């Protein structure tokens, strides 16, 4: 990630401040630059309304003021570029900008209304999580207050479904770039079909967890600081709450098997994790972009 940029989908509110804070942490840790993008509705979308030159000028000036404020929040230690874009939708504008800049990551904040430090998906994040071919990072509410923690650990939530290779590759790259340890987390014991006999489920869970972690560990570079851990709980939410989370940690999850190739699709397991995670989550496409 150090050779690429990080794109922030900026909004002039608390969610935008959270996105900037997390992007700044990741950029400082990896050496990446930050592209701050504010997307306004395109003229085509508002073609039924007569153009008001005065209002459009006011909106442009206000938007540039918001972008200048965003740059000030990031400080001088991070290379920052500011962009005002027009698009039919915010998600479309962010994805197009990410392609143009070669961004390795799109960072957006989450909607308010949930427990502080937890994430509730807003409309822009939801659209990105079901269409983007660029990894998307969701900054939990309250991230602005903990912006000086750096990147202290990378956790990759691995499973048995297709897409694990892309997830591991992304996790290893980020861990190396940030000089952070990597934790492999197995959610297999609680990611099994409903209706299984309890004893059989327990046995199957244990065997699968060991196999998944062994296979993932073998795929890691020998010189990488890595650990493995198995989630323990009767539900995804309970297991996530019981796990140890470091300040400055970042979690990576893969896309659902329903995702189109090279696209994101937030699966049910990741969605359940997201509701309880106190740290940022990156959702990785089934296959990464080259």
Feature-to-residue mapping (PLM):
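Structural beta-alpha unit
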Residues: 1-2, 15, 72-106, 220-251, ...
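Small/aliphatic-rich secondary-structure junction motif
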Residues: 1-53, 152-202, 218-227, 248, ...
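Intrinsically disordered, low-complexity Ser/Thr-rich linker and spacer segments
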Residues: 143-152
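Glycine-rich, Arg-bearing micro-motifs that act as flexible, cationic patches
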Residues: 105-127, 151, 250-276, 290
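Short beta-strand elements of ligand-binding domains
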Residues: 107-110, 135-142, 281-285
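A short acidic, glycine-rich active-site loop
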Residues: 53-65, 201-211
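General small-molecule cofactor/ligand-binding pocket signal
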Residues: 35-37, 81-85, 137, 183-185, ...
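Active-site phosphate/pyrophosphate- and oxyanion-stabilizing loops and adjacent acidic/basic residues
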Residues: 24, 68, 72, 95, ...
């Amino acid at each position: 990630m150090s050779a690429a940029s990080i794109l922030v989908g900026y909004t002039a509110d608390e969610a935008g401040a959270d996105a900037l804070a997390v992007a700044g942490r990741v950029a400082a840790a990896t050496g990446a630059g930050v592209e701050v993008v504010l997307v306004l509705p395109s003229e085509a979308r508002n073609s039924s309304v007569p153009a008001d030159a005065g209002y459009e000028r006011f909106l442009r000036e206000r938007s540039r003021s918001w972008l200048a404020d965003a740059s000030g929040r990031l400080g001088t230690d991070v290379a920052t570029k500011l962009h005002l874009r027009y698009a039919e939708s915010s998600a479309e504008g962010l994805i197009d900008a990410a392609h143009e800049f070669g961004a390795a990551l799109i960072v957006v904040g989450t909607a308010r209304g949930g427990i502080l430090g937890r994430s509730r998906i807003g409309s822009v994040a939801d659209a990105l999580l079901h269409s983007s071919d660029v990894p998307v990072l969701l900054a939990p509410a309250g991230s602005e207050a903990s912006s000086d923690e750096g990147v202290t650990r990378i956790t990759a939530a691995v499973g048995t479904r297709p897409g694990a290779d892309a997830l591991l590759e992304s996790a290893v790259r980020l861990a190396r770039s940030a000089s952070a340890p990597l934790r492999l987390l197995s959610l297999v014991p609680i990611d099994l079909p409903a209706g299984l006999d309890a004893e059989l489920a327990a046995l199957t869970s244990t065997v699968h967890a060991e196999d998944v972690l062994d296979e993932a560990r073998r795929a890691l570079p020998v010189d990488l600081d890595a650990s493995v851990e198995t989630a323990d709980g009767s539900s995804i939410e309970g297991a996530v709450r019981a796990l140890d989370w470091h300040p400055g940690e970042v979690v990576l999850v893969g896309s659902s098997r329903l995702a189109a190739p090279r696209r994101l699709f937030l699966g049910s397991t990741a969605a359940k994790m997201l509701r309880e995670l106190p740290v940022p989550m990156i959702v990785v496409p089934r296959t990464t972009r080259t």
